[in-house]
Amino acid sequence: MASRQPSEGSTVLISLILWVIIFALLNIGSNFFRSSEGATILGGFVGSFLFFLQMTFIGAIKRDVKLLETVLAVIITAMISSSVHRVSGTTSIIFSIGWIFYLNHASTKIYSKLEETNTVVSGKKRK
């Protein structure tokens, strides 16, 4: 059974809605994220999901995310997480770098399979 990929429009809409929800949760729960060291680090982890959703949003629109968009997304994420706590901002940068490696690995894995499929299909000769 082949899995269907969501359309660009639904990906943009879902990532935007989830971004707004996580942004609201960070602001509403800011007192919780300031309460202890573990909660502060958790705030950075939750903030890094904003980065992941921003990259999903940009990738669905542009299909190719460059270094500038990635750096701007990390800066925006760090600023939002820093509004909760400074340590949350720092840890969100660290977790966002982890997301960069994960997204790069997943992208390479998916697109290498697509290239192999295209090579096999186009490599056949007709007589």
From Swiss-Prot:
Keywords, comma-separated and alphabetical: Membrane, Transmembrane, Transmembrane helix
Pfam families (alphabetical): Keratin_assoc
Entry-linked InterPro entries: KRTCAP2
Chief site of localization: membrane
TM spans (from-to): 13-33, 41-61, 65-85, 87-107
Assembly behavior: Component of the oligosaccharyltransferase (OST) complex.
Protein name: Protein KRTCAP2 homolog
